[in-house]
């Protein structure tokens, strides 16, 4: 379960991580269903690299639609019937699948979102952090947790979640033929991410601006893009 997949306009590394895990499991003979939101022009159902994608609901509707799909699955109906295990991805808040799936459930979270929730506004931000920091740990008490780094595990421990397993992010294989580029500067940096406030790309811009002769390539897009570009013109 994940709120987006990599074909979503706002999909990113979290979604790619889960897809790669799913593709590996599918290659080992397991049946993998990736339940996610239905974004514009996306099919309700498709199979990609051995993984079956099942979509329904938008930004907020994805959660109740997933609950309905899991409940239907317990009755032997729909895409989620016969499920042996569930991976519930917590992108701020989880699906709380443990309450409705009827199957062993693992909670996957890349990091805590304490610093990100204010972007959602004062009311929604407080509600989101309450669900993430207070409700989810109670619902998932005793369930396996997976995260991607020691820093994230320590953040989980601060919320009372002990013993989270670390499965680090991987890398896709390097292509056999990589073009060779001439060095443009003594210091050449690259950022690769969605352009949203909490990625703090402006920190890299400020650092490079203070380093004579340095070059920075900003790769990515997002709703914060115009603000990031405006930052380039501001005096440092």
Predicted regions: what they are:
Residues 4-6, 192-196, 201, 222-223:
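Short donor-sugar binding/catalytic loops of nucleotide-sugar-dependent glycosyltransferases
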Residues 151, 170:
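Carbohydrate-associated surface elements
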Residues 146, 180-199, 205-217:
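Conserved donor-binding/catalytic core segment of Leloir-type glycosyltransferases
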Residues 55, 71-95, 100, 106:
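Short N-terminal targeting/anchoring amphipathic segment
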Residues 2-6, 24-60:
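N-terminal strand-loop element at the rim of the active site
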Residues 123-145, 154:
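Membrane-proximal helix-turn-helix segments that form the acceptor-binding/catalytic region
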Residues 85-87, 100-118, 125-128, 146:
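Active-site proximal beta-strand in glycosyltransferases
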């Amino acid at each position: 379960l994940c709120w987006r997949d990599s074909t979503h306009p706002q999909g990113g590394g979290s979604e790619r991580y889960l897809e790669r895990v799913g593709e590996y499991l599918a290659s080992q003979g397991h049946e993998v269903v990736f339940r996610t939101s239905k974004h514009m022009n996306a099919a309700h159902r498709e199979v990609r690299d051995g993984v079956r994608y099942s979509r329904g609901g938008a930004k907020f509707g994805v959660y109740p639609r997933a609950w309905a799909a899991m409940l239907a699955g317990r009755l032997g109906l729909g895409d989620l019937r016969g499920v042996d295990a569930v991976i519930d991805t917590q992108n701020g808040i989880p699906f709380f699948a443990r309450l409705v799936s009827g199957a062993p459930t693992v909670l996957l979270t890349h990091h805590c979102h304490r610093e990100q929730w204010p972007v959602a506004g004062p009311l929604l931000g407080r509600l989101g952090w309450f669900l993430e920091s207070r409700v989810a740990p109670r619902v998932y008490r005793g369930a396996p947790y997976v995260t991607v780094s020691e820093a994230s595990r320590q953040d989980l421990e601060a919320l009372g979640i002990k013993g989270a397993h670390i499965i680090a992010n991987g890398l896709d294989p390097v292509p056999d033929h990589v073009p060779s580029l001439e060095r443009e500067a003594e210091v050449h940096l690259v950022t690769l991410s969605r352009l949203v406030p909490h990625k703090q790309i402006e920190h890299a811009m400020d650092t490079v601006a203070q380093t004579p002769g340095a070059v920075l390539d900003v790769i990515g897009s997002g709703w914060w893009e115009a603000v990031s570009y405006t930052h380039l013109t501001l005096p440092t």
